[in-house]
Amino acid sequence: MARLNVKPTRMELSNLKNRLKTATRGHKLLKDKRDELMRRFVDLIRENNELRQTIEKELAANMKEFVLAKASENSLMVEELFAVPVHEVTLWIDIENIMSVNVPKFHVQSNTAREQEQGEFAYSYLSSNSEMDNTIQKTKELLEKLLRLAEVEKTCQLMADDIEKTRRRVNGLEYSIIPQLKETIHYIELKLEEAERASLVRIMKITS
């Protein structure tokens, strides 16, 4: 490891020792951050996989139920049921800081004035069968899970990027900066010891 190109003076030695303390402390903090990010990242990956499997199963089941419910209805009536969009959804995003990583938090609010006027469903449920009602309601309930899945996947992406950045910084300190500082400190200490011995020899010669 090449040492730093500095003058071998006591002032430089003191500066380098301070830099080494700072680098060592920073290295520990970054390692702790990296380890905690990795722990949370693994938890989120697990949640992401479980959520995706659950949503895929529920969507497949809902689709089958919808096909069966649709089969017992007149095609024109089914089109009329969904002809007018009356379900209004408001989505907003907050930012949460996790280990210095800004991640999104999705919030959703259903604003359905016509639903309140017409009843539980946002379409003419009086004209539909109970199977269709249940299928539509189950699909609506999936919205929160879908938003959570999007939130988790985006958080995983942002965390993965920050983990990689932190890993590079840790490696830079561990394998480059800290060894350079240590080697340069050792070099200056040797030079100062040599200068001190040479000075002592000169003094002894003068006094002898």
Swiss-Prot record:
Keyword annotations of the record: ATP synthesis, Hydrogen ion transport, Ion transport, Transport
Gene3D superfamilies given in the database record: 1.10.287.3240
UniProt xrefs under InterPro entries: V_ATPase_D
One GO BP annotation of this record: proton motive force-driven plasma membrane ATP synthesis
Presence of the UniProt keyword Ion transport in the record: yes
GO molecular function, one term: proton-transporting ATP synthase activity, rotational mechanism
Pfam family name, one: ATP-synt_D
Keyword DNA repair: no
Superkingdom of origin organism: Bacteria
Purpose of the protein: Produces ATP from ADP in the presence of a proton gradient across the membrane.
Family, as annotated: Belongs to the V-ATPase D subunit family.
Protein name: V-type ATP synthase subunit D
Native source species: Streptococcus pyogenes serotype M1
